[in-house]
Design a protein with these regions (language model features):
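Active-site pocket-lining/capping segments in soluble small-molecule metabolic enzymes
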Residues: 1-78, 82, 96-100, 104-204
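As written
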Residues: 91-92
Length: 204
């Protein structure tokens, strides 16, 4: 609740620490009407920074709450010094680099962008296959899906290694003969063609 956030921010500041709030959703038109209320809440709470990924949201918050420190979320997929410089020119105080950026690239970006705070994830999910930015192809085949060279790893056949209760590992190959023994559905073979169907309800 708003009261919980107020209490949390007050506690953090009383202990000389900083607190950041996220507004890093990618907005659909149906969400835009809610943005003024979100921004008013942020202005009321006065966090030490706000993490944003959507350029439109960044522009709106910058215009309507210029006193807030704006940070760019990892979901903005910042992978180069050019992208960092762009966001810096827009008024960003900190950029969280994309999860696929190597340590060597981070060092180079730091040298080329010395006057802005940079942050990176050290551990956690890799958020693969969202909006076409598939990292599986990069990782398994050294082919960038974002540059028209996708290896379509999502369509490969895989083997599962299951760890049993006794600690032993059993290899299982999923094929037409044993697929009905599993509780999950191998959807891909039941869909003709190369493209996924678009299925959408009132929730998106």
């Amino acid at each position: 609740t708003l009261e919980d956030l107020e209490e949390g921010i007050r506690f953090v500041h009383q202990n000389d620490k900083k607190i950041y709030l996220t507004l890093n959703l990618f907005m659909h038109n149906r969400d835009v009407a809610k943005l003024p209320q979100f921004v008013e809440t942020l202005r009321h709470l006065q966090p030490d920074g706000v993490l944003i990924a959507d350029p439109g949201v960044f522009m709106y918050v910058k215009e309507h709450a210029p006193e807030l420190n704006l940070f760019v979320s990892t979901q903005a997929n910042i992978c180069s010094s050019l992208a960092v410089k762009f966001w810096q020119q827009q008024g960003a105080k900190l950029c969280v680099l994309g999860r696929e950026v190597t340590f060597e690239e981070m060092q180079e970006i730091r040298r080329q962008c010395p006057d802005i705070l940079l942050e990176c994830f050290m551990h956690g999910a890799m958020c693969m296959s969202y909006s076409g930015r598939c990292l599986i192809s990069n990782y398994l085949a050294d082919r960038s899906a974002n540059q028209g060279k996708c290896a379509h790893c999502c369509r490969w056949h895989y083997k599962l290694h299951l760890r049993l209760k006794d600690g032993s590992v059993k290899e299982i190959e999923i094929n037409d003969q044993n697929k009905d023994a599993f509780e999950f559905l191998l959807e891909e073979e039941f869909r003709p063609g190369e493209l996924y169907e678009v299925v959408e309800d009132e929730h998106g």
